[in-house]
Amino acid sequence: MIKKASLLTACSVTAFSAWAQDTSPDTLVVTANRFEQPRSTVLAPTTVVTRQDIDRWQSTSVNDVLRRLPGVDITQNGGSGQLSSIFIRGTNASHVLVLIDGVRLNLAGGSGSADLSQFPIALVQRVEYIRGPRSAVYGSDAIGGVVNIITTRDEPGTEISAGWGSNSYQNYDVSTQQQLGDKTRVTLLGDYAHTHGYDVVAYGNTGTQAQPDNDGFLSKTLYGALEHNFTDAWSGFVRGYGYDNRTNYDAYYSPGSPLVDTRKLYSQSWDAGLRYNGELIKSQLITSYSHSKDYNYDPHYGRYDSSATLDEMKQYTVQWANNIIIGHGNVGAGVDWQKQSTAPGTAYVKDGYDQRNTGIYLTGLQQVGDFTFEGAARSDDNSQFGRHGTWQTSAGWEFIEGYRFIASYGTSYKAPNLGQLYGFYGNPNLDPEKSKQWEGAFEGLTAGVNWRISGYRNDVSDLIDYDDHTLKYYNEGKARIKGVEATANFDTGPLTHTVSYDYVDARNAITDTPLLRRAKQQVKYQLDWQLYDFDWGITYQYLGTRYDKDYSSYPYQTVKMGGVSLWDLAVAYPVTSHLTVRGKIANLFDKDYETVYGYQTAGREYTLSGSYTF
């Protein structure tokens, strides 16, 4: 039986729970209920990725990190910097909540879904990823799951790194964390990344004119943070980061008109917070401001030509969260306030708009004998659609020591985005999209194998669809998603294995047709070992059958895209205790495949990098 100690101060002795790169059950996570708790006490499937994992995989983008995780489908209109989408457990890309240090990502242009091709991998120190509904804790968007990207660095020191690769890829990065006295810590980072890219082609999506050019990507990033401990219990921080990106892409072109095929994104975020960390009570107050300007233009005419577009959004956030240890668990409560302001012209909306949301929530976690109970409830008051309530509950039963059954149910929702509300085809009377989800799971530790098998169902109603007859958006769609997820990690001698299998049947509940761009089956496998001081890693991904639309002629036709097996090989060697060199071959067998119909992937790519720490 799990030891009857506080779930926030002692860790379970069993190897529960979710598939993760950091496989220790004592790993602390903050995303499940906003405060640190051992991962073994989180009943929802949870994955943790550390900076060490990212360096070992030699990932050059956030999408490359996320594609390795259970339940995740990544689609992208080509290579680095091109438009991308995240699908979790078959839900829409807009049904994934992305947080940066616990604060909702400012979605440039109010599109309603996160494009993480633009977020710099240099900022990512840790990723916490939770599958399933979480609107009862975070509000809108958290239907499929939550991805929390954490930028806080844990280890002091300085690192200088550089990398080069295929398609003229180059990356230079400098970061440092220094202690100023006993109570103050400063972190600084600068990063530059550039690739010439390749011609993504975009067959059928660019009009009648071919665009045989390289579609490259350039990103420049700055980051700074100051943390101070006032006492053993009280601490505060100020943090800011910004990035300046340029992306070339293939766009629709008509002869005689400008070719809008360049994107320029400016983004900056500033956070400040005060935390109290007592023995029984924890509290934090965080304020955040972010501002994004997203230009699309013809470089021959510039960003300020009449043919260019500008999506500009400012986001203001205040979060007050509290947690108290009670019995063998805890109770949490808090308030979120958010205001989003858009400039005229954003998302093709003539006027600028403000949207405000205030949410109050209550969470609870308690262990009673062999049972663990978790629950949450939340009420959101939105300036557009009024009040909306969500709730969720889970129970875990350790029926044999080291083996647990988990059952959960939750509701969640997605608020309509700016274009759906106020655009040329908008409908200001739209309601939120709603979801009801059930999940059952078994997990345990058998002969050194840490495993979990779960089945789930997700019914989504009031989906916002475009009506071709009325030329308006309406709440008229429904989706039914059923799936099975199996994960395991184990060691065999010097070899470390991490494997996952996903089966997802995601369908339009009205027409019974498959939802587009979701693989019905996926297999993901990571093998790591060390030999003669060389650290080796092999990554395998099977991406199953998917469906998409062919936009080359009207009416648009549904096309079937076959499955593909992809292999990556990575190796690292510590030349000295300070200097490490790394090399990687992605798509080892040069497979030709697409995740979005008509947009080519890069094929085989090579990277070589080195880092020096002191």
From Swiss-Prot:
Pfam families: Plug (PF07715), TonB_dep_Rec_b-barrel (PF00593)
Domain TBDR beta-barrel per the UniProt entry, residue ranges: 155-614
PROSITE patterns with a match to the protein in the record: TONB_DEPENDENT_REC_1, TONB_DEPENDENT_REC_2, TONB_DEPENDENT_REC_3
Keywords: Calcium, Cell outer membrane, Ion transport, Membrane, Metal-binding, Porin, Signal, TonB box, Transmembrane, Transmembrane beta strand, Transport
Residues annotated for Ca(2+) 2 binding in this entry: D213, D215, Y249, D250, D261
Example GO biological process: monoatomic ion transport
Motif (TonB C-terminal box): 597-614
UniProt cross-references to CDD domains, sorted A to Z: ligand_gated_channel
A GO CC term assigned to this protein in UniProt: cell outer membrane
Gene name for this UniProt entry: btuB
Annotated residues for binding of Ca(2+) 1: D199, Q211, D213, D215, D250
Domain TBDR plug: 38-152
PANTHER family tied to this protein: COLICIN I RECEPTOR-RELATED, TONB-DEPENDENT OUTER MEMBRANE RECEPTOR
Positions of cyanocob(III)alamin binding: L83, S85, N92, G110, S111, A251, T309, R517, Y551
Motif position, TonB box: 26-33
Official protein name in the record: Vitamin B12 transporter BtuB
Transmembrane segments: 158-165, 169-178, 184-195, 217-227, 232-248, 263-277, 279-296, 309-325, 328-337, 353-369, 371-381, 385-400, 403-417, 434-443, 449-458, 473-490, 494-509, 517-529, 535-550, 558-572, 585-596, 602-614
Recorded family membership: Belongs to the TonB-dependent receptor family. BtuB (TC 1.B.14.3.1) subfamily.
